[in-house]
Amino acid sequence: MAKSKFERNKPHVNIGTIGHVDHGKTSLTAAITKYFGEFKAYDQIDAAPEEKARGITISTAHVEYETPNRHYAHVDCPGHADYVKNMITGAAQMDGAILVVSAADGPMPQTREHILLARQVGVPAIVVFLNKVDQVDDAELLELVELEVRELLSSYEFPGDDIPIVKGSALAALEDSDKKIGEDAIRELMAAVDAYIPTPERPIDQPFLMPIEDVFSISGRGTVVTGRVERGIVKVGEEIEIVGIRPTTKTTCTGVEMFRKLLDQGQAGDNIGALLRGVDRNGVERGQILCKPGSVKPHRKFKAEAYILTKEEGGRHTPFFTNYRPQFYFRTTDVTGIVTLPEGTEMVMPGDNVTVDVELIVPIAMEEKLRFAIREGGRTVGAGIVASIVE
């Protein structure tokens, strides 16, 4: 029912609440839906359904709401581990985040951890909601907490001095007890989110990229590669590059077909077959990508932020050490890589999230924020994201 009433003529933005346990993320989510969406009570959001992303089970609650300017899809996770998994797997892509900090406690360990994760996985912007301000009588104390939050954000390379911080009480909003710190604060928060979190560039406006899933030879016509266009547009007659695994080559797309029909272009979201000029059936393979020339480079060495599954989640039963050699599943293929642990880290236990250095045995078309699964013999044992490219 709720699906029908959202008009799609507004820009769509994906956001989520992050922050320390019990600082009020779920209450705030409920309060936002009260004024901007179809009201969802705290316990409706807290009973988050489980879903699978890259072979990992995550509990996530999804709500949607809209301001006069935008339509929002909002994710809230019940447990800390769910946040870690969610942000690393990209199960719920975030264009921005609302960091919830209790004014009574100030920044806590998970506050720091979520900011670090947001930095590592490339969340573009953060807005802060200083919650539970009714529990703090001293204005100076409130100012101190705000300063602390700004310094913490700056220490992780977010613009701490410029980030909007809105003070209020999610509970007051839910209980209609104090309009100023309740409803008014929630409306002020959403105005800040509207203004400060940038509208994401639509996939269709980005440079063309398509992971190759399959390769066919069609007699008399040449080689066709199939896959789902990840972003951008490819037009018949355009020059494109084949990147990854082998040296980069240029070719021309001489045909695009979808559902057995010939088209003059393929665009983000389309499952297409692309006919490639002068490419031998053996000259291209699954795991490579087609892309706009010069837009993506192949790389072997990168720093990754990774989450390692627990035994209960179907992961490893034992820790791993430096020189661990699993497969890294990028887009459509597995590539073996050698893992180097950070200095001072002797081993990584199942359930840890960790920053590691990886060197692949062959180069893969790679950009920062590219996500991957870590596998051993086809079984997923972890998930990760490229935090930065080394070479």
Swiss-Prot record:
Residues 169-171 are annotated as: G5. Residues 76-79 are annotated as: G3. It comes from the Bacteria. Its EC number is 3.6.5.3. It catalyses: GTP + H2O = GDP + phosphate + H(+). Its main location: cytoplasm. InterPro entries: EF-Tu_GTP-bd, EF-Tu_GTPase, EFTu-like_2, EFTU_2, G_TR_CS, P-loop_NTPase, Small_GTP-bd, T_Tr_GTP-bd_dom. Residues 10-201 form the tr-type G domain. Gene3D superfamilies: P-loop containing nucleotide triphosphate hydrolases, Translation factors. GTP binds at residues 19-26, 76-80, 131-134. One of its GO terms (cellular component) is cytosol. Mg(2+) binds at residue 26. SUPFAM superfamilies: EF-Tu/eEF-1alpha/eIF2-gamma C-terminal domain (SSF50465), P-loop containing nucleoside triphosphate hydrolases (SSF52540), Translation proteins (SSF50447). One of its GO terms (molecular function) is translation elongation factor activity. Keywords: Cytoplasm, Elongation factor, GTP-binding, Hydrolase, Magnesium, Metal-binding, Nucleotide-binding, Protein biosynthesis. Residues 19-26 are annotated as: G1. Residues 55-59 are annotated as: G2. Residues 131-134 are annotated as: G4. Monomer. GTP hydrolase that promotes the GTP-dependent binding of aminoacyl-tRNA to the A-site of ribosomes during protein biosynthesis. Belongs to the TRAFAC class translation factor GTPase superfamily. Classic translation factor GTPase family. EF-Tu/EF-1A subfamily. This is Elongation factor Tu. It comes from Rhizobium meliloti (strain 1021).
